[in-house]
Amino acid sequence: MGFGDFTGLCRMAPLPLCSSVGPITSIASGVGIEPDCYARNIEVANTIIFQGAASAMHIIALVMTVVMILHVRGKFTAVGRKEITTFFYLYMLLTFLSLCVDAGVVPPGSAPYPYFVAVQAGLASATVTCLMINGFVGFQLYEDGTPLSLWMMRLCSAAAFVISFLVALATFKTWAGLGPTNTIGLFVVLYLLNAVQLFVYVVLQVLLVMRTLHDRWPLGDIAFGMFFFVAGQVILYAASAPICKAISHYLDGLFFATTCNLLAVMMVYKYWDSITKEDLEFSVGTRMNNWEVKDLLPEEDRRATVYHDDPYGQSTAYDNSYSPSPNRHSRY
């Protein structure tokens, strides 16, 4: 197997793009590489669903992503809130499209199938690029949540989507010198570039924690995220067929890879949540039970409050008019 050849990968793992690459076969009179083992189909209401277990995991991933987005949106003053939300939106869109492709909503061999797989490849690259750009937010090189920050992330993610989409479609349709048997370009943009971007993100976050935070616990979130992602890729590309045969085609590597990817994304959320905090004064209006009066002060103790430990630096309630600071706080 040469560099950029998908034959060995597709024999082991039931990837959606494998139906659109490889040499022309005499049996099917078309391109495609069939995996050695893949999960059995299930029938629900006279409808055949491919990859039943992986499809169910995609649905669970969609639900969990919605929960994470709601939690992120609830931290109104956290650093990088809008940027990390963009990442979760892209991941949710990628998961939904993967559900459609894996479950057979768009069946392999149909006319629109290559386009859907090309969009899936583009979304995968856009999601990884968005995550890498998120890695720079914590260094405060530019103000987070501003049009500069958001549009830079959107444009970079859009560029990654367009490049991967066009390369994948050109590979499937034999355009611009690419083709089902010339898959080097697709391999580079879909695997090498994405791997480099993930590596950059991890290095940036390790540097951020080591150089700017006193708490080292977020390194555990990074380590667990790396473990889950790498474990999913190893199972998918190195152990899918043996696992599938051992459990009688009930599951294959695609199910485990989908599960591990979800766990890795959850670790990204956990890491972001652990290094950011919300300014209480801006959130008290949305959380009704933050303050509860236990006992009223005696009449003789009702006097001006002294702010000895107040982070805003006022000495008494009468020194100057109080106005809440607009600055957001984080542990960076």
UniProtKB/Swiss-Prot annotation:
<dbReference type="Pfam" id="PF12271">
    <property type="entry name" value="Chs7"/>
</dbReference>
<keyword id="KW-0812">Transmembrane</keyword>
<dbReference type="GO" id="GO:0051082">
    <property type="term" value="F:unfolded protein binding"/>
</dbReference>
<comment type="function">
    <text>Chaperone required for the export of the chitin synthase CHS3 from the endoplasmic reticulum.</text>
</comment>
<keyword id="KW-0256">Endoplasmic reticulum</keyword>
<dbReference type="GO" id="GO:0005789">
    <property type="term" value="C:endoplasmic reticulum membrane"/>
</dbReference>
<feature type="transmembrane region" description="Helical">
    <location>
        <begin position="158"/>
        <end position="178"/>
    </location>
</feature>
<keyword id="KW-1133">Transmembrane helix</keyword>
<protein>
    <recommendedName>
        <fullName>Chitin synthase export chaperone</fullName>
    </recommendedName>
</protein>
<feature type="transmembrane region" description="Helical">
    <location>
        <begin position="184"/>
        <end position="204"/>
    </location>
</feature>
<feature type="transmembrane region" description="Helical">
    <location>
        <begin position="116"/>
        <end position="136"/>
    </location>
</feature>
<feature type="transmembrane region" description="Helical">
    <location>
        <begin position="52"/>
        <end position="72"/>
    </location>
</feature>
<feature type="transmembrane region" description="Helical">
    <location>
        <begin position="219"/>
        <end position="239"/>
    </location>
</feature>
<dbReference type="GO" id="GO:0006457">
    <property type="term" value="P:protein folding"/>
</dbReference>
<keyword id="KW-0472">Membrane</keyword>
<feature type="compositionally biased region" description="Polar residues">
    <location>
        <begin position="313"/>
        <end position="332"/>
    </location>
</feature>
<dbReference type="GO" id="GO:0015031">
    <property type="term" value="P:protein transport"/>
</dbReference>
<comment type="similarity">
    <text>Belongs to the CHS7 family.</text>
</comment>
<keyword id="KW-0813">Transport</keyword>
<dbReference type="GO" id="GO:0071555">
    <property type="term" value="P:cell wall organization"/>
</dbReference>
<dbReference type="InterPro" id="IPR022057">
    <property type="entry name" value="Chs7"/>
</dbReference>
<comment type="subunit">
    <text>Interacts with CHS3.</text>
</comment>
<feature type="region of interest" description="Disordered">
    <location>
        <begin position="309"/>
        <end position="332"/>
    </location>
</feature>
<feature type="transmembrane region" description="Helical">
    <location>
        <begin position="249"/>
        <end position="269"/>
    </location>
</feature>
<keyword id="KW-0961">Cell wall biogenesis/degradation</keyword>
<feature type="transmembrane region" description="Helical">
    <location>
        <begin position="87"/>
        <end position="107"/>
    </location>
</feature>
<keyword id="KW-0653">Protein transport</keyword>
